[in-house]
């Protein structure tokens, strides 16, 4: 289960964030006066279907609120920014549509990702699926009022500014300083210049929406002690990170670490053979058994009710995913952890997932077995190991 990014993915946009009053805003007695403003977001926006916009507008606040409650945040108000796309170096979009979610301070807290249904693999009956996570929010907040291109490869995420210099803004924990110096100066070729699209100011939602009602109505169920203690670097240890996070949560401890788990299971591997090794489901079950658990393999995605019951009983679930885009090479398979589940105020059932690559959680439609991840790929949730 090794991680593999496409060589480079580019996000081309101009981000200009400012809070300004708007005329003719709808009145809402539940929203404070300072919330009746909007944030202008400059993005590259082409051919976004009306259905996508409507879905984002209708459901974003419910999904955002579920994560707020998972993070134990207070009630807040948000507005939905205009959509942008992520482009690969062949200048084609990755197929998803992204919407920034802005707070009343003008900062991005979350990114809404809307993906067209992948008919061959998806169990969802909907034309589009919606997921919410922090994703690139911190990176975008660092580059207000600048035209940037964001690139990513196996070493992390780069921002290329208007002076064509690349800066590594999200590095992998295992990246050595020597390698870091070499990668900071790339890429600077014509491909980067050509990917910079001209953009104009676009209007986000006309007013902020308070999540007060949504917050009170939602049902949230979470592994009580689940925390993100470490994230996956330039290695193939996704299963190690997943099991460590689950066991730390269910035992309420900090003693499990991915590298130690991998060393326990593969004691004779050295160098890159160790760095890029993965685990089989059998090895994952065996490790759980050595730690006093009785993990069970389920050859499908867990249902919402199963997640609800297992989480209530303090039993962790590992997601086993198969990459839709390519079944070959590094990270054709990937492991993730189930944090919990939520029933939104609109009745939608979602599963909360942690991808070891990320510093935050993401929402997943409980009826959709295809998970979009932060590098633009999609993983089919084909099996589960529960009982950690």
From Swiss-Prot:
An example Gene Ontology CC term for this record: extracellular region
Pfam family name, one: Peptidase_C47
GO molecular function: cysteine-type peptidase activity
GO biological process, one term: proteolysis
Gene3D superfamilies with a match to the protein in the record: Cysteine proteinases (3.90.70.10), Staphopain proregion domain (3.10.500.10)
PTM info: Cleavage leads to the activation of ScpA probably by an auto-catalytic manner.
Superkingdom to which the source organism belongs: Bacteria
Entry-linked InterPro entries: Cystatin_sf, Papain-like_cys_pep_sf, Pept_his_AS, Peptidase_C47, Staphopain_pro, Staphopain_pro_sf
Subunit structure: In the cytoplasm, prematurely activated/folded ScpA forms a stable non-covalent complex with ScpB.
Family stated for the protein in its record: Belongs to the peptidase C47 family.
Function: Cysteine protease that plays an important role in the inhibition of host innate immune response. Cleaves host elastins found in connective tissues, pulmonary surfactant protein A in the lungs, and the chemokine receptor CXCR2 on leukocytes. Proteolytic cleavage of surfactant protein A impairs bacterial phagocytosis by neutrophils while CXCR2 degradation blocks neutrophil activation and chemotaxis. Additionally, promotes vascular leakage by activating the plasma kallikerin/kinin system, resulting in hypotension.
Protein name: Staphopain A
Organism: Staphylococcus aureus (strain Mu50 / ATCC 700699)
Gene: sspP
């Amino acid at each position: 289960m090794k991680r593999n990014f496409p060589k480079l993915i580019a996000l081309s946009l101009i981000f200009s964030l400012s809070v300004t009053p708007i005329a003719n805003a709808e009145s809402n007695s539940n929203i404070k006066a300072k919330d009746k403003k909007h944030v202008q977001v400059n993005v590259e926006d082409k051919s976004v279907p009306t259905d996508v916009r409507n879905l984002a507008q209708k459901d974003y606040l419910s999904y955002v609120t579920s994560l707020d409650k998972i993070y134990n945040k207070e009630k807040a108000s948000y507005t939905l920014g205009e959509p942008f796309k992520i482009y690969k170096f062949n200048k084609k979009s990755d197929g998803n549509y992204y919407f920034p979610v802005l707070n009343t301070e003008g900062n991005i807290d979350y990114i809404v990702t809307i993906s067209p249904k992948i008919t061959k693999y998806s169990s969802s009956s909907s034309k589009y699926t919606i997921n919410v996570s922090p994703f690139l929010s911190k990176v975008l907040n660092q580059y207000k009022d600048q035209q940037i291109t964001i690139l990513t490869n196996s070493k992390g995420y780069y921002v290329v500014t208007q002076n064509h210099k690349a800066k590594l803004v999200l590095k992998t924990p295992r990246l050595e300083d020597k390698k870091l110096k070499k990668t900071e100066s790339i890429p600077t070729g014509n491909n980067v210049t050509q990917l910079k699209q001209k953009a104009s100011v676009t209007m986000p939602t006309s007013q902020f929406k308070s999540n007060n009602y949504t917050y009170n109505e939602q049902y949230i169920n979470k592994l009580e002690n689940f925390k993100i203690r470490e994230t996956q670097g330039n290695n193939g240890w996704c299963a190690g990170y997943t099991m460590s996070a689950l066991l730390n949560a269910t035992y309420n401890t900090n003693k499990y670490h991915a590298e130690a788990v991998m060393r326990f299971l593969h004691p004779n591997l050295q160098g890159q053979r160790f760095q890029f090794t993965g685990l089989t489901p059998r090895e994952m079950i065996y490790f759980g058994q050595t730690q006093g658990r009785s993990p069970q393999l389920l050859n499908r995605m867990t249902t919402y009710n199963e997640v609800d019951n297992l989480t209530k009983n303090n039993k962790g679930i590992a997601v086993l995913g198969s990459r839709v885009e390519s079944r070959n090479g590094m990270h054709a398979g990937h492991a993730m952890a189930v944090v919990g589940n939520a029933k939104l105020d609109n009745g939608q059932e979602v599963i909360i997932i942690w991808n070891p690559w990320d510093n935050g959680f993401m929402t997943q439609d409980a009826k959709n077995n295809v998970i979009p991840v932060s590098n633009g790929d999609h993983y089919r949730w084909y099996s589960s190991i529960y009982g950690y």
